[in-house]
Amino acid sequence: MIAVSFKCRCQILRRLTKDESPYTKSASQTKPPDGALAVRRQSIPEEFKGSTVVELMKKEGTTLGLTVSGGIDKDGKPRVSNLRQGGIAARSDQLDVGDYIKAVNGINLAKFRHDEIISLLKNVGERVVLEVEYELPPVSVQGSSVIFRTVEVTLHKEGNTFGFVIRGGAHDDRNKSRPVVITCVRPGGPADREGTIKPGDRLLSVDGIRLLGTTHAEAMSILKQCGQEAALLIEYDVSVMDSVATASGPLLVEVAKTPGASLGVALTTSMCCNKQVIVIDKIKSASIADRCGALHVGDHILSIDGTSMEYCTLAEATQFLANTTDQVKLEILPHHQTRLALKGPDHVKIQRSDRQLTWDSWASNHSSLHTNHHYNTYHPDHCRVPALTFPKAPPPNSPPALVSSSFSPTSMSAYSLSSLNMGTLPRSLYSTSPRGTMMRRRLKKKDFKSSLSLASSTVGLAGQVVHTETTEVVLTADPVTGFGIQLQGSVFATETLSSPPLISYIEADSPAERCGVLQIGDRVMAINGIPTEDSTFEEASQLLRDSSITSKVTLEIEFDVAESVIPSSGTFHVKLPKKHNVELGITISSPSSRKPGDPLVISDIKKGSVAHRTGTLELGDKLLAIDNIRLDNCSMEDAVQILQQCEDLVKLKIRKDEDNSDEQESSGAIIYTVELKRYGGPLGITISGTEEPFDPIIISSLTKGGLAERTGAIHIGDRILAINSSSLKGKPLSEAIHLLQMAGETVTLKIKKQTDAQSASSPKKFPISSHLSDLGDVEEDSSPAQKPGKLSDMYPSTVPSVDSAVDSWDGSAIDTSYGTQGTSFQASGYNFNTYDWRSPKQRGSLSPVTKPRSQTYPDVGLSYEDWDRSTASGFAGAADSAETEQEENFWSQALEDLETCGQSGILRELEEKADRRVSLRNMTLLATIMSGSTMSLNHEAPTPRSQLGRQASFQERSSSRPHYSQTTRSNTLPSDVGRKSVTLRKMKQEIKEIMSPTPVELHKVTLYKDSDMEDFGFSVADGLLEKGVYVKNIRPAGPGDLGGLKPYDRLLQVNHVRTRDFDCCLVVPLIAESGNKLDLVISRNPLASQKSIDQQSLPGDWSEQNSAFFQQPSHGGNLETREPTNTL
């Protein structure tokens, strides 16, 4: 049994009779009240003696409310034996029972008799100055049985005090130096009513002004000069109960408290073994439950004062706890006993304290214990890469998550000061900025917005080599705890700061702690965009207080990242402290191509998190083990369960990724940087890649005579590592495209050149014909329709051309093409294809196996085909290739012109003058991102997809330029072929489905509601095999039909809201709220429509019905739909 007693009893003072002297020690007052310091009959030893001066003001005819005993005739020095409740002396919060009065208004009392002392105090006047000696408080030592924790308490002054007495402080004699200790809490005062502060607690700071190194008089002055409301940082003791940590069954905990006082425990319910259990949900910081050290979050409450909780509701259990008397007996099952080993037995029986419990697979239900905290959650990614993330607090209705263990204040990070808990820091050691002078900091002001500080490495605390980085954090205030941070500045609040204020305190379970980025010692560079440097600490604190009105603040933080040890290659271990409710900051992914024995990959590291500050982890590093449990053959679920078992420290075994390793230099790889100035024109490069986070981004072709080719430093097959200093590590192709779009006039590319042996097999060395002859199959038909559209509507920062006098330009700003399969080679751990990268003019592209539609819209004189020329892929005979060679040259040149021009003047003119029909038909901007597969067909059986290729090019289409349009175009098989031709077509179609890329068009469409039908003329449905919302039916001649929508179009955005992961229940309200105008971004698979038409119709003209309604899904199955449908 563990009994912890915290008693705070109030002595009831009887009323003094009129003939009783207010300063005389009466018979009833010979015994000091309980809880007071023992009154010594002898002098205090010199080494434990402290002194202070107390000034009291009283009115004429009133008394101080002070009882004095002792005198030269009363066996002892004059001392305070009692303070009357509500008296002047008690309310001053400067005197305590047991203090020795050395002098009164400068008159030494050493030789005064008791009656003379009483007479002096009665007749001293209105101002009374007492010289007081007191016994110094004992020194608190943190050891195996006691640990220190901190808590921030906000108090309101009553008069000019907060209701507690402080002693200690710095002293000339080091042996007498003490922390500023609270020795007494006045009953009924502000501190007592708030309930957190207890005698023996240490006062560390007041409104951010730290008291370390201040004398007792200075500490008293700071308390008097602060405002009516002050934030006090308190350090308190927490008992370490070894018996709890080593217990093997239920425990009986007895806690003594004052009747009516709160234990500081919040309860909740959880389901365990299909039974409801009562567990501890929260423990208030510095409460009785927190200080005793026997109770922890997650403990099961089995009984309260002998009443079993087995069949009690949460409300009943809470009431039982509130009705407890001065002795609370709790039967608990410590939370650490509920953790099962990864391969542990299904049933574990624990018996103690006459109670038997049976547990099975408790981990699956443990998640419901803390629904408002951070957990390790399993989260499949949209691109089929399962990811293990450490997100923010899940909503109450979130799926079951996993509990994370609390962070022990004794656990310390070996990497950075910022990861230390305040309670673990010696009180003589506080963090400071690594750059000591104001001048050096001013030179860095312009760098505050950069993600990485340009300052060189410096020496931080404990001799560590660190570098500083900055990040921006947005906090939303909690109604109870606020933001949960306290700043620390100079000694004087009005002094101009020479360095930014520090975060000196972070409240447990506050927004500041839950964000996982802020740590004690971080420098606050700006608050809501206002720099803190060269302002006063009071101004910085006021900014923070003002933000609490709006419940939101944006902080710019500078923090240290360790550089003492940075592994360059090989395998190493990293230990991360795991705080309760705080994310580690790493995302672990399992690539879709992962095989048994392959490790998991670190795919993201949150900036400013514990993992980031170690300085040793990088994107792409392989995670081999967690707490010595290997992950080679572990699924993501296993990894989640292993992390669940982790205690205060998480030990990760890491293998450095090849691209992060220095060993690549010895393999012949060359890394360099190329800067390109586009001057309004295109770069002339084509990039290829996939949506897998760690697949390489490759330069697949260069425009002949283009900017990139003229540099001579960029070649086909080179890998792009970074764009404008933004690393592409762990980023898919879409992000690389976005970075290039936003790059501006100057584009800096970090290039990795392959080895000489590898570059010998460059795509340029192998003509296309030789590869096609190896395949021994039909040739591909060349078609300019393969050219994808420009993403100018998605990335509006496309640089327009400034050289309108030039007749034509080579290539586009970012022009990517797709090639055929060929011999692959290995470089840096990635498979590349030697034939994947060719110029658009060299490659064979695929055209629709259909007859043309030449239905012309009379109002603009454009054919249907010209307005919506698809990027569909298909196979055609070899004869068609010769027929369209000249045509391809024309279209290639025309589309290149459009690509180079950016948003041309003609387009801008149309945008200004376009009516509704022009907007619907002519102003649609196409953005095509093509996805395909790469396979090796070297006379072997077909293998499954080994790499998901994704390529992109940017093109802006406008059919308003007449010399680019073409009214008729035929790239179809002969319509009069016999059964053999039909069989051959089916065979080619099957080959196409296996080998050809899967094009996906992105369209931006603006629809206007039909005034007669009051709808947009289309219905939507949820995807069957793939998450998403798709167009199901389209009303002929309705807005959707006129706008170019087709069945199986997937809605990616509705009125600029991303709907990729939405279902119909979320999308339909968005469309309903759009009013008369609807902006859509949709993706389309042309092969779906191609296959549908091919199966429905014999060769011949298309019917309007066939062009509007498709009955079959694509071969990938991703466009199948299911009920319910909703007509909009």
UniProtKB/Swiss-Prot annotation:
Indicate whether Repeat appears among the record's keywords: yes
Chief place where the protein resides? cytoplasm
Q: Which residue intervals define the domain PDZ in the entry?
A: 53-136, 150-238, 252-336, 472-561, 573-658, 673-755, 1004-1086
Xref: InterPro entries:
GRIP1/2, PDZ, PDZ_6, PDZ_sf
Which residues does the annotated region (Disordered) include? 754-798, 935-981, 1093-1128
Identify the keywords attached in UniProt to this record, alphabetized: Cell membrane, Cell projection, Cytoplasm, Cytoplasmic vesicle, Endoplasmic reticulum, Membrane, Phosphoprotein, Postsynaptic cell membrane, Repeat, Synapse
Instruction: Give the domain section of the comments.
Output: PDZ 6 mediates interaction with the PDZ recognition motif of EFNB1 and EPHB2 and with the C-terminus of PPFIA1 and PPFIA4. PDZ 4 and PDZ 5 mediate interaction with the C-terminus of GRIA2 and GRIA3. PDZ 4, PDZ 5 and PDZ 6 mediate homomultimers. PDZ 7 mediates interaction with PDZ domain of GRASP1. PDZ 7 domain binds CSPG4. PDZ 6 mediates interaction with the C-terminus of liprins-alpha. PDZ 1, PDZ 2 and PDZ 3 mediate interaction with the PDZ-binding motif of FRAS1. PDZ 4 and PDZ 5 mediate interaction with PRLHR.
- What disease is this protein tied to? Fraser syndrome 3: A form of Fraser syndrome, an autosomal recessive disorder characterized by cryptophthalmos, cutaneous syndactyly, and urogenital abnormalities including renal agenesis or hypoplasia. Additional features include abnormalities of the larynx, ear malformations, and facial abnormalities.
Q: What is the name attached to this protein's record? A: Glutamate receptor-interacting protein 1
